[in-house]
Amino acid sequence: MHLIIAGREYSGSTTLSQTFGEWGAANMEGGRWGPNEYHDHWKLPHISNFSPPPPDEVASVVACYPDARDGDYTRTGLSHEEQAQIMALSPKLKEMVQRYHLQYHLHPSFYGQDDHIMVGAHFDEGILGPIYFDYGGDGQYADRRVSNRSYEKQILELGPDTILVLVTASPDAIRQRMKDNPHLHGALQDADVERVLARYEEEYADSLLTRKTRLDTTSATIEESTGEIIEKITALMTDDDRQRIKGGAA
Protein backbone atom coordinates (compact mmCIF):
# COMPACT_ATOMS: atom_id res chain seq x y z
CA MET A 1 0.00 0.00 0.00
CA HIS A 2 1.23 3.48 -0.86
CA LEU A 3 -0.29 6.11 1.40
CA ILE A 4 0.12 9.79 2.27
CA ILE A 5 -1.75 11.16 5.29
CA ALA A 6 -1.58 14.96 5.36
CA GLY A 7 -3.02 17.54 7.68
CA ARG A 8 -2.19 20.70 9.51
CA GLU A 9 -0.45 20.38 12.89
CA TYR A 10 -3.09 19.55 15.54
CA SER A 11 -5.48 18.19 12.90
CA GLY A 12 -4.84 14.59 13.95
CA SER A 13 -2.83 13.36 10.97
CA THR A 14 0.01 11.96 13.10
CA THR A 15 -2.35 10.40 15.64
CA LEU A 16 -4.37 8.72 12.90
CA SER A 17 -1.25 7.47 11.14
CA GLN A 18 -0.35 5.75 14.39
CA THR A 19 -3.78 4.23 15.00
CA PHE A 20 -4.01 3.16 11.35
CA GLY A 21 -0.58 1.57 11.73
CA GLU A 22 -1.83 -0.35 14.76
CA TRP A 23 -4.79 -1.56 12.71
CA GLY A 24 -2.44 -2.56 9.88
CA ALA A 25 -0.21 -4.53 12.24
CA ALA A 26 -3.23 -6.46 13.49
CA ASN A 27 -5.09 -6.88 10.22
CA MET A 28 -2.76 -6.74 7.19
CA GLU A 29 -0.70 -9.65 5.90
CA GLY A 30 2.93 -8.82 5.15
CA GLY A 31 4.45 -5.38 5.13
CA ARG A 32 6.09 -3.43 7.93
CA TRP A 33 3.69 -2.01 10.47
CA GLY A 34 5.91 -1.14 13.41
CA PRO A 35 5.21 1.97 15.51
CA ASN A 36 7.67 4.10 13.55
CA GLU A 37 7.65 2.42 10.14
CA TYR A 38 5.73 5.32 8.63
CA HIS A 39 7.66 8.46 7.64
CA ASP A 40 6.63 11.58 9.55
CA HIS A 41 9.66 13.85 9.07
CA TRP A 42 8.61 17.11 7.45
CA LYS A 43 7.69 19.51 10.24
CA LEU A 44 10.88 21.43 11.01
CA PRO A 45 12.76 20.84 13.28
CA HIS A 46 11.25 17.37 13.73
CA ILE A 47 12.83 15.71 10.70
CA SER A 48 14.43 12.63 12.23
CA ASN A 49 13.24 9.10 12.87
CA PHE A 50 12.11 8.41 16.41
CA SER A 51 11.95 5.30 18.55
CA PRO A 52 9.06 4.76 20.97
CA PRO A 53 10.67 4.24 24.38
CA PRO A 54 10.35 0.98 26.30
CA PRO A 55 7.85 1.17 29.18
CA ASP A 56 10.50 1.75 31.83
CA GLU A 57 11.83 4.81 29.96
CA VAL A 58 8.53 6.55 29.15
CA ALA A 59 8.60 8.75 32.25
CA SER A 60 12.10 10.06 31.54
CA VAL A 61 11.27 10.74 27.88
CA VAL A 62 8.10 12.62 28.82
CA ALA A 63 10.04 14.61 31.40
CA CYS A 64 12.35 15.76 28.60
CA TYR A 65 9.62 16.10 25.97
CA PRO A 66 6.38 16.98 27.83
CA ASP A 67 4.31 17.08 24.63
CA ALA A 68 4.95 13.32 24.25
CA ARG A 69 2.76 12.56 27.26
CA ASP A 70 -0.11 11.40 25.02
CA GLY A 71 2.10 8.82 23.32
CA ASP A 72 3.16 10.88 20.29
CA TYR A 73 6.94 10.49 20.10
CA THR A 74 7.42 12.02 16.65
CA ARG A 75 9.03 15.12 18.17
CA THR A 76 11.62 13.15 20.16
CA GLY A 77 13.92 12.02 17.35
CA LEU A 78 16.40 14.84 17.90
CA SER A 79 17.77 16.29 21.10
CA HIS A 80 16.80 19.84 22.02
CA GLU A 81 20.29 20.94 21.03
CA GLU A 82 19.96 19.26 17.63
CA GLN A 83 16.56 20.85 17.08
CA ALA A 84 18.09 24.26 17.82
CA GLN A 85 20.85 23.55 15.31
CA ILE A 86 18.27 22.72 12.65
CA MET A 87 16.35 25.93 13.34
CA ALA A 88 19.57 27.97 13.19
CA LEU A 89 20.16 26.95 9.57
CA SER A 90 19.69 29.66 6.97
CA PRO A 91 16.56 29.56 4.77
CA LYS A 92 18.74 28.33 1.90
CA LEU A 93 20.04 25.40 3.94
CA LYS A 94 16.60 24.56 5.36
CA GLU A 95 15.27 24.44 1.81
CA MET A 96 18.09 22.17 0.66
CA VAL A 97 17.74 19.78 3.61
CA GLN A 98 14.00 19.42 3.14
CA ARG A 99 14.18 19.07 -0.63
CA TYR A 100 16.82 16.35 -0.42
CA HIS A 101 14.95 14.73 2.46
CA LEU A 102 11.73 14.47 0.48
CA GLN A 103 13.48 13.31 -2.68
CA TYR A 104 15.13 10.54 -0.66
CA HIS A 105 11.71 9.25 0.40
CA LEU A 106 10.70 9.07 -3.27
CA HIS A 107 13.46 6.57 -4.03
CA PRO A 108 12.25 3.43 -5.84
CA SER A 109 13.51 1.28 -2.96
CA PHE A 110 10.73 2.63 -0.76
CA TYR A 111 8.12 1.90 -3.40
CA GLY A 112 9.45 -1.62 -3.79
CA GLN A 113 8.27 -2.40 -0.26
CA ASP A 114 4.81 -3.80 0.41
CA ASP A 115 3.86 -0.59 2.19
CA HIS A 116 5.22 2.97 2.03
CA ILE A 117 3.39 5.40 4.31
CA MET A 118 4.31 9.08 4.57
CA VAL A 119 2.75 11.61 6.93
CA GLY A 120 2.69 15.21 5.74
CA ALA A 121 5.37 14.75 3.07
CA HIS A 122 5.28 17.46 0.39
CA PHE A 123 2.13 18.98 1.91
CA ASP A 124 3.80 19.80 5.24
CA GLU A 125 7.12 20.78 3.74
CA GLY A 126 5.68 22.77 0.85
CA ILE A 127 3.23 24.72 3.01
CA LEU A 128 5.33 25.39 6.11
CA GLY A 129 8.48 26.38 4.22
CA PRO A 130 7.07 29.51 2.57
CA ILE A 131 4.98 30.58 5.59
CA TYR A 132 7.46 30.08 8.42
CA PHE A 133 10.95 29.46 7.07
CA ASP A 134 11.34 31.92 4.18
CA TYR A 135 11.90 29.46 1.37
CA GLY A 136 9.93 27.96 -1.49
CA GLY A 137 7.44 30.81 -1.78
CA ASP A 138 6.02 32.43 -4.90
CA GLY A 139 8.90 33.67 -7.02
CA GLN A 140 11.54 32.06 -4.81
CA TYR A 141 13.87 29.25 -5.81
CA ALA A 142 12.08 25.87 -5.90
CA ASP A 143 8.62 27.41 -5.54
CA ARG A 144 6.76 24.71 -3.64
CA ARG A 145 3.46 25.26 -5.43
CA VAL A 146 5.30 24.18 -8.58
CA SER A 147 7.61 21.53 -7.13
CA ASN A 148 4.75 19.80 -5.30
CA ARG A 149 3.20 18.84 -8.62
CA SER A 150 6.59 17.61 -9.80
CA TYR A 151 6.86 15.42 -6.71
CA GLU A 152 3.40 14.04 -7.37
CA LYS A 153 4.32 13.12 -10.93
CA GLN A 154 7.19 11.08 -9.51
CA ILE A 155 4.88 9.52 -6.93
CA LEU A 156 2.42 8.51 -9.63
CA GLU A 157 5.20 6.93 -11.68
CA LEU A 158 6.47 4.94 -8.70
CA GLY A 159 3.16 4.23 -6.98
CA PRO A 160 0.16 5.01 -9.22
CA ASP A 161 -2.06 3.44 -6.56
CA THR A 162 -1.00 6.00 -3.92
CA ILE A 163 -3.84 7.08 -1.62
CA LEU A 164 -3.96 10.64 -0.29
CA VAL A 165 -5.88 11.37 2.90
CA LEU A 166 -6.40 14.97 4.04
CA VAL A 167 -7.12 15.25 7.76
CA THR A 168 -8.68 18.53 8.79
CA ALA A 169 -10.43 20.24 11.69
CA SER A 170 -12.12 23.57 12.30
CA PRO A 171 -10.05 26.61 13.33
CA ASP A 172 -11.68 26.60 16.76
CA ALA A 173 -10.80 22.93 17.28
CA ILE A 174 -7.21 23.53 16.17
CA ARG A 175 -6.83 26.46 18.57
CA GLN A 176 -8.27 24.47 21.46
CA ARG A 177 -5.83 21.62 20.81
CA MET A 178 -2.96 24.09 20.64
CA LYS A 179 -3.99 25.34 24.07
CA ASP A 180 -4.55 21.88 25.57
CA ASN A 181 -1.29 20.30 24.37
CA PRO A 182 1.16 22.82 22.88
CA HIS A 183 3.84 21.18 20.75
CA LEU A 184 7.45 21.84 21.60
CA HIS A 185 8.96 23.85 18.75
CA GLY A 186 5.71 23.62 16.80
CA ALA A 187 5.45 25.88 13.78
CA LEU A 188 1.78 26.81 13.75
CA GLN A 189 0.89 30.19 15.24
CA ASP A 190 -2.58 31.20 16.41
CA ALA A 191 -2.84 34.07 13.94
CA ASP A 192 -2.10 31.76 11.00
CA VAL A 193 -4.60 28.96 11.62
CA GLU A 194 -7.07 29.94 8.89
CA ARG A 195 -4.32 30.74 6.40
CA VAL A 196 -2.56 27.41 6.93
CA LEU A 197 -5.79 25.41 6.77
CA ALA A 198 -6.61 27.17 3.49
CA ARG A 199 -3.25 26.18 2.02
CA TYR A 200 -3.87 22.52 2.83
CA GLU A 201 -7.22 22.77 1.08
CA GLU A 202 -5.55 24.34 -1.96
CA GLU A 203 -2.91 21.64 -2.14
CA TYR A 204 -5.55 18.93 -1.80
CA ALA A 205 -7.62 20.48 -4.60
CA ASP A 206 -4.56 20.86 -6.85
CA SER A 207 -3.12 17.42 -6.13
CA LEU A 208 -2.53 15.14 -9.10
CA LEU A 209 -3.22 12.10 -6.93
CA THR A 210 -6.65 10.79 -7.89
CA ARG A 211 -7.16 8.22 -5.11
CA LYS A 212 -7.87 10.80 -2.46
CA THR A 213 -10.25 11.31 0.41
CA ARG A 214 -10.64 13.51 3.45
CA LEU A 215 -11.96 13.41 6.99
CA ASP A 216 -12.81 16.05 9.57
CA THR A 217 -11.77 15.39 13.17
CA THR A 218 -13.39 18.50 14.66
CA SER A 219 -15.91 16.74 16.88
CA ALA A 220 -14.94 13.08 16.50
CA THR A 221 -13.17 10.93 19.06
CA ILE A 222 -9.90 9.25 18.13
CA GLU A 223 -11.77 5.94 17.96
CA GLU A 224 -14.40 7.39 15.62
CA SER A 225 -11.79 9.00 13.36
CA THR A 226 -9.77 5.77 13.31
CA GLY A 227 -12.82 3.84 12.15
CA GLU A 228 -13.47 6.44 9.48
CA ILE A 229 -9.92 6.49 8.12
CA ILE A 230 -9.83 2.67 7.98
CA GLU A 231 -13.11 2.64 6.05
CA LYS A 232 -12.01 5.34 3.61
CA ILE A 233 -8.56 3.90 2.96
CA THR A 234 -9.80 0.35 2.43
CA ALA A 235 -12.36 1.68 -0.06
CA LEU A 236 -9.49 3.12 -2.13
CA MET A 237 -7.08 0.19 -1.84
CA THR A 238 -6.08 -1.89 -4.81
CA ASP A 239 -7.63 -5.33 -5.00
CA ASP A 240 -4.25 -6.84 -4.13
CA ASP A 241 -3.96 -4.78 -0.96
CA ARG A 242 -7.55 -5.48 0.01
CA GLN A 243 -6.85 -9.20 -0.29
CA ARG A 244 -4.04 -8.79 2.25
CA ILE A 245 -6.59 -7.91 4.94
CA LYS A 246 -6.90 -10.89 7.25
CA GLY A 247 -10.28 -12.48 6.76
CA GLY A 248 -10.70 -10.68 3.44
CA ALA A 249 -12.55 -7.62 4.76
CA ALA A 250 -11.95 -4.53 6.88
Model-derived regions, located:
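Pre-Walker A (Motif I) flank of P-loop NTPase domains
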Residues: 1-3
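Phosphate-binding beta-loop-alpha motif at adenosine-nucleotide cofactor sites
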Residues: 6-7, 161-169, 173, 177, ...
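Conserved substrate/cofactor phosphate-moiety recognition/catalytic segment
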Residues: 18-108, 124, 128-130
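NTP-dependent small-molecule kinase module
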Residues: 24, 180-184, 188-250
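Loop/turn-to-beta-strand initiation segments
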Residues: 112-116, 161-163
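Structural recognition of the conserved hydrophobic beta-strand(s) that form the central parallel beta-sheet
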Residues: 116-119, 167
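A glycine- and Lys/Arg-enriched "phosphate-lid" helix/loop adjacent to the NTP-binding pocket
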Residues: 125-202, 243-246
